[in-house]
């Protein structure tokens, strides 16, 4: 396949005003995408965004470009990424566009597309769009220009969709939940969803100002929600990221429940109800404790490369339904086409209600093994992973760890770093093993 120039694994992303993230490129991208998407279908595109101040600028530019190509545009305003995927399906739109840089700081932004079925845009379509980007922008004739409208009830539609994933015979009455919206796209949705299901909700990170998204709050910064759960004597906490596609949780003791533990809860619940199809897909970074806990239940486990795109690919290849990353991207293909933090939280709460159990009880049988990650910078074009010294150090550590440990060495995709990850039963031993391999990598650099 031809190498992509603009699109990465999750659309286009970067610092606002530099590189590819400029209003000029957004305008041209809208036009190029419109040219490709207008060849068939409804000629209708939905645009949603998170709460970054630059979202308004990019929304206007994309809107103009799509209209210039003859496509009708429907604006949602600030809405979670999975809401764009859902409404793209229900409106039978040709595509959905999300303006977001997910968990990144406010000065970054990004643009990604969903296809008409709510899944990530096909690689070949992205290549077609890139080919159109190389051409001069030519506006359609005036009578063919696209029209722009706003979906006034997008929030209500998505709230009802989220609630529809919770069993009708149960409520959340009696639960006190802290919900952290990361000052992002879920700020006006997530608290309402859990309140309407009966919970007492304490909302934090729900006052976006355009520049505070993901700032010391949300799924990538768990300190605030852990403190709040303890201070408020809450039953649990739910932390979302800036665009609402990932989740982390907190139990009543203030302990973080990560994506691996959430996958374990969902797999156990599905198996107990006889609806688990196949097994669970994690990634190379998933904790060995998840693998061992699923083995004990005879639930198959497979690892993909890091990234929810690769988790999805492996789920489709194996025809399984549940997968995700320890960072909190959770996919359940019986409940959506992309990662959805709110829905994942609802499914965990449903498991709690069905089993009349606390979050602590649902995770008690899964032992998270100590995991140490060391980043080693290297210079030059050579590959330290091919060094005999590094290979020998890895073999020595793997031999000493046995079946209760794991070593993973991989290159960073964005920096000249080798990531050394070691897991095992004893934290001090794991740390020593990781440093042993890291020293070998340094000497080979």
UniProtKB/Swiss-Prot annotation:
The keyword Cell inner membrane does not apply. GO terms for cellular component: cytosol. Its EC number is 5.4.2.10. Its cofactor is Mg(2+). Binds 1 Mg(2+) ion per subunit. PANTHER family: PHOSPHOGLUCOMUTASE (ALPHA-D-GLUCOSE-1,6-BISPHOSPHATE-DEPENDENT) (PTHR42946:SF1), PHOSPHOHEXOSE MUTASE (PTHR42946). CDD domains: GlmM. The active site is at 102 (phosphoserine intermediate). One of its GO terms (molecular function) is phosphomannomutase activity. Keywords: Isomerase, Magnesium, Metal-binding, Phosphoprotein. The keyword Cell inner membrane does not apply. It comes from the Bacteria. It catalyses: alpha-D-glucosamine 1-phosphate = D-glucosamine 6-phosphate. Mg(2+) binds at residues 102, 241, 243, 245. This is Phosphoglucosamine mutase. The modification Phosphoserine is found at residue 102. Belongs to the phosphohexose mutase family. Catalyzes the conversion of glucosamine-6-phosphate to glucosamine-1-phosphate. Activated by phosphorylation. One of its GO terms (biological process) is carbohydrate metabolic process.
